[in-house]
């Protein structure tokens, strides 16, 4: 381990929090004997989480691994109905589609960028399936979702 110093300091955090609704807090840990998947299992366990790997310039190995756990809230759009699990701000519209909800979340959660950190420093995680295009374009219905995806 390279140290247990946490960045930013408490004083820096307080100043950053005056301008931003979310402030990344981090420390560096030497993990030469850990794989990203092993770290994910140890950090997330049986709960909800994600593991993202970065690849730069077509390299085979990733430069960064991003692990997230215990989402504060989730949004799910199924059959045109947007549902919320967990804690999502009241100003997030649930009757205007996924894109409007995400736009409001991005407006609310503003974080500073730290040049010494990897490009992904937190924020919204998830995926948008192809069908979200129906919020922009009028397309015919697709076959029934028999796999509950």
Residue ranges and their predicted role:
Residues 1-149:
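Signature of the chorismate-utilizing enzyme
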């Amino acid at each position: 381990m390279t140290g247990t110093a946490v960045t930013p300091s408490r004083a820096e955090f307080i100043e950053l929090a005056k301008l931003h609704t979310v402030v990344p807090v981090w420390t560096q840990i030497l993990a030469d004997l850990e794989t990203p998947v092993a770290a994910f299992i140890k950090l997330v366990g049986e709960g909800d989480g994600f593991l993202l790997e970065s690849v730069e310039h077509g390299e085979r190995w990733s430069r960064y691994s991003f692990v997230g756990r215990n989402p504060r809230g989730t949004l799910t759009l199924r059959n045109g109905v947007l549902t919320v699990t967990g804690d999502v701000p009241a100003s997030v519209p649930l009757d205007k589609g996924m894109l409007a909800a995400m736009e409001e979340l991005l407006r609310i959660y503003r974080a500073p960028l730290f040049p010494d950190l990897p490009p992904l420093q937190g924020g919204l995680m998830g995926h948008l399936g192809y069908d979200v295009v129906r919020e922009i374009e009028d397309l015919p219905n697709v076959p029934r979702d028999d796999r509950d995806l």
